[in-house]
From Swiss-Prot:
Gene behind this protein: eif2b
GO molecular function: translation initiation factor activity
Protein name (database record): Translation initiation factor 2 subunit beta
HAMAP family for this protein: eIF_2_beta
Residue ranges of the region described as Disordered: 1-30
Organism: Halobacterium salinarum (strain ATCC 700922 / JCM 11081 / NRC-1) (Halobacterium halobium)
Source organism superkingdom: Archaea
Pfam families in the record: eIF-5_eIF-2B
Protein purpose: eIF-2 functions in the early steps of protein synthesis by forming a ternary complex with GTP and initiator tRNA.
Gene3D superfamilies in the record: 3.30.30.170
Length: 132
């Protein structure tokens, strides 16, 4: 049996793997207006999915949308001003790309590590370290 026949046989006998394409999913932001404030209802669920601190994510949101923000007693983020779901979602996508996804392997298995004034993204999957 030559290589091509072995390869064909292996491909025929391999099991079909089904499931979702990714195991990492950030919930879509659930935002609503409350007066002149935008309330991010599922902020805690987003933090759980990202495995990041609320202070870091909230600071990024504030800087990107150019407003002040706080966390209320229910754990919801309150952004001063009116921001739509799309704007918050795009901001979260930018956060994930910068602070969660490994630039080398593309996996979300990362930790943020502080070294002096520098923040590094350390990938648990491939071992890469990059400054963010």
């Amino acid at each position: 049996m030559d290589y091509e026949e072995q390869l064909d046989r292996a491909m025929d006998e391999k099991p079909d793997v089904t499931g979702s394409e990714t195991r990492f999913e950030v919930p879509d932001p659930n935002v609503r207006k409350e007066g002149n404030v935008t309330v991010y209802e599922n902020f805690q669920a987003t933090l759980d999915a990202l495995s990041r601190t609320q202070d870091h994510v909230l600071k990024f949101l504030q800087n990107e949308v150019g407003t002040s923000a706080s966390i209320d007693e229910s754990g919801r983020a309150r952004l001063t001003g009116e921001f739509g779901q799309r704007r918050v979602s795009d901001t979260l996508d930018a956060y994930v790309e910068t602070y969660v996804t490994c630039p080398e392997c593309g996996l979300p298995d990362t930790n943020l590590e502080t070294d002096g004034d520098t923040i590094q993204l350390h990938c648990e999957a491939c071992g890469a370290r990059s400054t963010v």
